[in-house]
C-alpha cells in the first residue's frame, strides 16, 4: 500500500501497511523515500463504492419501511484509519500510486484522500500538486462536514472546496434538517455552497421519494441559509402537482421571504383557496399577505404583521372581503391587534382591539364555539403596576374598555357598560400572623341606552393565619363600602347612593394522613375536613344600579366564596357555615396525585337572601343542596372526572357531569363525557331574557390507529333534548413509515343556530422539514378531541406513553 502526505510545496511519499504480506511493500517504500515515485499493491482498505443512481428512490406512497429506521444513511465513505495529520496536509492512500513529487500523483485502487475535514474515496484519482486539485472516477464518494456526495466523476480543489461532479447523489444534514438530491451535474462553489443541474431533492430518508421537487437547477448556500430553484415542479407519489418558474426556500429552518404553501378547504361556502406570501422584514418583524377566494363569496384578502422586541411584542390581523356575493354585503372585514409593552420591571401596558364589519360575521365564517364566545368584542387599553409601597406589596391598574356587541339572529343586542376608565389598586402587608390590606376601585360606567355613572369601591380588611402541619384557622374582618354618582337618564334623576357592609368569615381545615397500598403500590392517603363560616348582614340594594354583577353557578368551589355574585354591585347576605371534606391519594414515591374527591354542603342560620335585582327576599331553607366532585389520573393512561349538584329536597340531581379518558400511548385516545343540567341557559331571546331548558349532551371522541400508518379521528356530540347532533367530525390521517410525509382529510358538520348547520371538509399535507399544505389539523382537533396529537408529530414508536 502506498501513502502520500503533502503540505505545499513539499511532497513526501511514504509506505505503511498492516499484515504479513505487506512487509515487502514497506521495505521498498523505505528504500525509495527520496525517490519522486512510490508504488505498491495491497488489499482493499474500504468497501466498494456503490454505483450512483439518478433516482431518489421509490415513489410508492404507502410502502412500509421494514428497517424501522427512518434516518438510516448508507455508510459510503471510509477513512484511512491512520493517525491524524496536521492542518492543511493532504494524505493519499491507495493500492497503487505513481507520479512525480511537486507535480502530479496518480492513485488507483481503493483510493482514500484526506485533508482537514474532507475525505474522498474513489476507484482512481489524479492529484495535481500545483493546483491542489484532485480528479477522481469511475465512482467516488466525498464526505465533508455532514455532507456526502457520490457520483461518477469529480474534479475538486481541496483548498478552495470548489469543483464539479457528474451523475451525483448528495445527502446532507445540518441542525437536524436532512436534504438529499440526485443531479446530472453538481458544482461546488465553496464550503456549503452548491449548484445542482437537472436535479431532484427532498427531505426524506435515503431511498424514499414519496415526494420530491424536480428542478432544472438549484443553488444552495448554507452560509446564507437559502436555496433557489428554477423551473421547479412539486411531485407527489410520482405525479407532478405544482410548477413554478422560480422558488426559494430556507435550508436551516430560519425565516425568509417567499411564497408559502397554499391552503385549500371545502364547505358550505364552496371551495376556498388561499395563497400566502411571507415577508421576513427584519429579525424581529415579519408579515404575511394571503390573497384568496371563497367559492360562493368571492375574493378575500388576509394580512398579518408580527413584531417582537425585548420590551414589547404584538400582532395585528386583518381579513377583508371587498364584496360578499352570498350575503350581498360589501367591505366585510375582521380586525385584531394585540400588544404588550414592558415599560419597566414594575410597569406594563397593552392593547387588545377586536372589530368586525357586521353582527353576522362570526355566524358566516366561524363555528358555533366562536359564535358563542364572541358576542362582545373587546377594545381595551391597559396599564398595570406591580411593586412595593408603604412596606407592603401594591398591585394597581388603569384600563379603558369598550365593546363591539354583535346582535343575535333576532337582531337583539345585550350591550355591557363601557369602562371609561377603571382604576384599581390592591395593597397588602404581612405583620406576624396578620395581614392587613385594602382594595379600591374607581370606575366610570358609560352606556348609550341605560343610566350610567361612576362607582367607587373601598374594601379594607385584616386576616390572620394560624397554620401548622396538620391544620389551619384563618379569620378575616372587612368593611365593604360602595359609593355611586349616577347621571340623569330619561325620567331618572341624577343622584348619589352608597352601601356599607361589614364582612366576617373564618376558614379552617385539618389534614389527616395515612400510608397504605393502592393501585399496586404504596400511597399516602389524606382526609381533609374544612369549615367556612361567613357573615354579611342583609341590606336592600334595589336602589343601586347593576353595572356588572351576575350570579355564579353553585358548585363545590362556591361553598368557600365570600360573595356569591360576580362584580361589586350586588353583595349577598350571609350567616352560613360550609362543611366539606375531601380526600386525596398521592403516589408514595413521587408525590404525584392519583385521586381526589370531595363533598360538601352549606348550612344557613337565616333565610334572608339578596336577589339579583337588589331586593331582599326569603328563602326558607336550613341547608343547601349537596355538591361533590371526583377526579383521578391513574398514571397517564386513565383520566376520570365527575361533579354533581344534588337537590336533597326534591331528591334529584340539578346538574352533573362525568367524563373518562383512556390514553395508553401517543396517538391513542378514547374520550367520553356526559353533561346534564335541569335548568340551564340555552340562548338569549329577542326580548333580552334567556331561554332556560333542560340540557343533556353526550360527547364522544377518539383518535386511534387502524394500521401502523393510518389513524382515525372522530367526534360525536349529541343533544338529547334537541334530538340532534351538535357536532359530527370524522377524519383519517396517514403518516409514511419513514416519517417523510403525513396527510389527513376531515369532514365536519356543526350547529350554528337553532335550525342552521354548517358543513366543512378540509385536508392537510405535511412534508418533513419543508412545509405544510392545507389547514393545520391541530387548530381544530385538540379542542374536538382532548389529548389529540397530529399523526405527523407522533414518534416512530406508537407505543410510547404520553
UniProtKB/Swiss-Prot annotation:
GO terms for biological process: Gram-negative-bacterium-type cell outer membrane assembly; lipopolysaccharide transport. Keywords: Cell outer membrane, Membrane, Signal. The keyword RNA-binding does not apply. Residues 1-29 form the signal peptide. One of its GO terms (cellular component) is transporter complex. Belongs to the LptD family. This is LPS-assembly protein LptD. The gene is lptD.
